[in-house]
From Swiss-Prot:
GO terms for cellular component: cortical endoplasmic reticulum; cytoplasm; cytosol; endoplasmic reticulum membrane; membrane; plasma membrane. InterPro entries: OSBP_sf, Oxysterol-bd, Oxysterol-bd_CS. ipid transport protein (LTP) involved in non-vesicular transfer of lipids between membranes. Functions in phosphoinositide-coupled directional transport of various lipids by carrying the lipid molecule in a hydrophobic pocket and transferring it between membranes through the cytosol. Involved in maintenance of intracellular sterol distribution and homeostasis. Involved in lipid countertransport between the endoplasmic reticulum and the plasma membrane. It comes from Saccharomyces cerevisiae (strain ATCC 204508 / S288c) (Baker's yeast). Keywords: Cell membrane, Cytoplasm, Endoplasmic reticulum, Isopeptide bond, Lipid transport, Lipid-binding, Membrane, Transport, Ubl conjugation. SUPFAM superfamilies: Oxysterol-binding protein-like. Coiled coil: none annotated. The gene is OSH7. This is Oxysterol-binding protein homolog 7. Present with 2350 molecules/cell in log phase SD medium. A 1,2-diacyl-sn-glycero-3-phospho-(1D-myo-inositol 4-phosphate) binds at residues 64-69, 126-129, 157-158, 351, 355, 359. There is a cross-link at K276 (Glycyl lysine isopeptide (Lys-Gly) (interchain with G-Cter in ubiquitin)).
Length: 437
């Protein structure tokens, strides 16, 4: 479903839409030798000394969202783009959708949602915090000749909240979600307490009430260990809950204890809502995950998902020259270019310029009594699961794929060659209201 879908899409040319310089060590500023800098652990003794100087002034449990951290721990992508890590195994999602058995469909949904957590930098890096109004779009050309589309926007800055939409129209699959990371300092660790939620719908499969089959999926918390002393590493911890029409699972992401235990282990049991147990989930979220049928005493565990045998399908993004100034890759380009060559002095200065401009805009809005309104996502209405949803009405019906694709592409430029329409800058709530009237 490629670019010929653009023929009748209305479009106009896009008209536009205290610093820490010098903190990085000479080692951190040295040029890379072919390696991806996201995979280089730059938090050596010098880096830990810098972090210690910053964090020694904090109390355990305090909010880190307003603390400026050194750029050597930053990944070269925004959180809005990093969310797509969870969407890079569409083959597993398509398998789930095509399964006719409700229990096996749930099992495949669990496998799909677990599949993406291992994708990320090899070193401990955090994504760039999106600025208010920042947006990111992407698409996938799938092996089955269909396309998937993704739209995300930063709808709140304090607290940070990212809203996103993903759809494979021709397979009747839709995903909506919000990511709400609340950062805390925990001594030798920092934590991102993930309070967001994902909602997956199979639009052509109806539940007992005649509505699209729906799954709600929470997120494990993310811990950066060893930020002051010892070796830094990422751990996922606590619980991830997946709830479907008939089945549910609470998967515990186990964190290693001081004396015993192992890293990266998961454990959970798939049950129905009467408490009957069906399957046990085990293994490691960044290695091999297993499933065992609890209904058969002689059952042995089998592979649910092997991260070494499945390869992620990365999203495609429009060329930089076609992007608006608030699109993630264009917005952060000078920062990510500097990070790519480990020039942390330039990265810090460029990041400061972007964030300082946002502070000035926020101050001006406060002085003028003007409220910020997102352009792509509208606030939820009573009874909805999430805080925000894409403003655009996506036509319902399994025979309306052409109209669905058109609606998605009218929301924001996604495919190469698309340009911004005059309506783009109108607040989402107004565009949503016009649709309803």
């Amino acid at each position: 479903m490629a670019l010929n879908k653009l023929k009748n899409i209305p479009s106009l040319t896009n008209s536009s839409h205290s610093s820490i310089n010098g903190i990085a060590s000479n080692a951190a500023n040295s040029k890379p030798s072919g390696a991806d800098t996201d995979d280089i652990d730059e938090n050596d003794e010098s880096g830990q000394s810098i972090l210690l100087n910053i964090i020694s002034q904090l109390k355990p449990g305090c909010d880190l969202s307003r603390i400026t951290l050194p750029t050597f721990i930053l990944e070269k992508k925004s959180m809005l783009e990093r969310i797509t890590n969870q969407l890079q195994f569409p083959d597993v999602l398509l398998e789930a959708h095509s399964n006719k058995d409700g229990l096996q469909r749930f099992v495949k949904v669990v496998a799909w949602y677990l599949a993406g957590w291992h994708i990320g930098p090899r070193a401990v890096k955090k994504p760039l915090n999106p600025i208010l109004g920042e947006h990111f779009t992407a698409y996938w050309d799938l092996p089955n000749k269909q396309q998937a589309f993704y739209i995300a926007e930063q709808t709140s800055h304090h607290p940070p909240e990212s809203a996103y939409f993903y759809m494979i129209p021709e397979s009747n699959i839709r995903v909506d979600g919000v990511v709400v990371p609340k950062s805390k300092f925990l001594g030798n660790s920092s934590a991102a307490m993930m309070e967001g939620l994902t909602v997956l719908q199979f639009l052509d499969i109806k539940d007992a009430n005649g509505k699209p089959e729906k799954y709600t999926l929470s997120q494990p918390n993310v811990y950066a260990r060893g930020i002051l002393f010892g070796k830094m590493r990422i751990e996922l911890g606590d619980h991830m809950v997946i709830m479907g029409p008939k089945y549910q699972v609470d998967i515990e992401f186990k964190t290693k204890g001081f004396i015993s235990g192992t890293y990266d282990a998961i454990e959970g049991t798939i049950k129905d809502y009467d408490g009957k147990e069906y399957y046990q989930i085990s293994g490691k979220w960044n290695d091999i995950m297993y499933i065992k049928d609890l209904r058969e005493k002689s059952s042995k565990k089998t592979v649910l998902f092997d991260t070494h045998q499945h390869f992620p399908l990365a999203p495609k993004v429009r060329p930089l020259e076609e992007q608006g100034e608030y699109e993630s890759r264009r917005l952060w380009k000078k920062v990510t270019d500097a990070l790519a060559v480990r020039d942390h002095e330039v990265a810090t200065e460029e990041k400061f310029q972007i964030e300082n401009r946002q502070r000035e805009l926020a101050k001006k809005r406060a002085e003028d009594g003007v409220e910020f309104h997102s352009k792509l996502f509208r606030r939820a209405e009573p009874g909805e699961d999430l805080d925000y949803y894409i403003y655009k009405h996506i036509p319902e019906g399994t025979d309306k794929h052409e109209e669905q694709i058109r609606s998605i592409l009218e929301t924001a430029p996604i495919l190469p060659g698309q340009t911004f329409t005059e309506k783009f800058s109108i607040p989402a709530y107004k565009k949503h209201g016009i649709q309803k009237n």
